[in-house]
């Protein structure tokens, strides 16, 4: 089942944490979920240029704190913090509450699954060949320290009449290993032929208890060509 489910949801409480952190009552749960959805949609739309990887929402008593993890935090903050204040005012108008916003930087943007998926989607919208876009992202992730990466695209690839799915994989991506730290990202490319879905899985190593990184010593192997699927027409 590791290949079917969302790898982040499967590892919650093991080596991944929730992106919405609050304890609601039965009365407040629906409104909180709807509010979180509005906040995420608003920030994704307003900060599309900054490479937003993750949005974490925390609630404590009557306080609401939003943490935005982005590849280019300087663009969000702006000169003397002018731009971040505009975003904060927009959020206050949207949800009618006081909000505090924290900005964090992605340490290795090229090894971030969400940013990689959005990168492939952007290239597809610019009519770059899908195989070239996939391989370019995979090479960048491996150079940034990823242990393995899998990229999957689905839709009317290259304008084909019949939709199909193709994927490439390099390195190891152990989806069934719960201690494996798997990053997952999804994006959609709006092309003239229709929507193309992009999924990216990035393996960043194994994590044991107390956050210890564990790497197996493997014998040197000859470099092999990246594997690709046999589904659909090649």
Swiss-Prot record:
GO MF, one annotated term: mRNA binding
TM segment ranges: none
Limits of the KH type-2 domain: 39-107
GO cellular component: cytosolic small ribosomal subunit
Gene3D superfamilies according to UniProt: 3.30.300.20, Ribosomal protein S3, C-terminal domain
SMART domains: KH (SM00322)
Example GO biological process: translation
InterPro entries according to UniProt: KH_dom, KH_dom-like_a/b, KH_dom_type_2, KH_sf_prok-type, Ribosomal_S3_C_sf, Ribosomal_uS3_bac-typ, Ribosomal_uS3_C, Ribosomal_uS3_CS
Keywords tagged on the record: Ribonucleoprotein, Ribosomal protein, RNA-binding, rRNA-binding
Subunit structure: Part of the 30S ribosomal subunit. Forms a tight complex with proteins S10 and S14.
Family, as annotated: Belongs to the universal ribosomal protein uS3 family.
Function as written in the Swiss-Prot or TrEMBL entry: Binds the lower part of the 30S subunit head. Binds mRNA in the 70S ribosome, positioning it for translation.
Stated name of the protein: Small ribosomal subunit protein uS3
